[in-house]
Amino acid sequence: MTTILGIDVQPTRLGFAVMVDGKPHDCWTTHIDGFPTKIAAALADCPPRIERIAREWPITRFVSHARRYGAVEARLDDAIFGMWPDVDLVAYKPTEWKVRCGLPGNADKARIFAHAVVLGWKPLDQDAADAACIAVAAAASMDEARQVAR
């Protein structure tokens, strides 16, 4: 059984999506307000065994935003490796995960949400929809790697 976790990163919340054996399992959003304890608690809601975690590598234009995202990313990565020390962690820029998920690189929020629903996910908000597409992108890149290995 292959379990993939997709994570959409925002300074005050994280979107999560769990994919099991190539099929949507669950997606949700957790408000963290940047606190490391809330990040660890949010990860505790995830399955105990995960093969790959894919998270968004946010692109920002302003230094203040980069610092906020960077702090959350560092805390998130620390919590991830604290729970799953041997997990395969990848980070995708927004354009990368959109293309790997089957969307144009410049797809807007509405199109991403609609695409997640078409793929079988039931997101309640945009962060969960983004996380779902990130999980699909991670599954696609794992499939590509398997094809190359053959």
Identify what each model region corresponds to.
Residues 1-150:
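Phosphate- and other anionic-substrate recognition elements at nucleic-acid/protein interfaces
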